[in-house]
Amino acid sequence: MHAVLTEVDTSGQPDPQVGLKALQEQIVPNARQTPGFQAGYWLRPLEDGKGTSLAVYDTEENAKAAAEALSVGSSPMPGVTVVRSEVRAVAASA
């Protein structure tokens, strides 16, 4: 298994509720449809506006393909910018 670790800057999104609604109604359902998706976790942004997600995929290839859609500098929704996107092998799970 491999995971995509993504960090976003949400400081351009003035209404956190709009961002949360888009996350729940668009981003998460779309992630579930990506090839090889196994699980995903999206963490609320900190006070500095940085949000983090971890999406787990069955293969490195599927994780890399998903990460390409969330490249640094891209904007998954208005007011949100990807600042970090990494693919890593999963070392352990519980």
Label each region the model flagged.
Residues 1-51, 58-69, 78-94:
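Short S/T/G/P-rich N-terminal loop/turn motif that feeds into the first structured element of a domain
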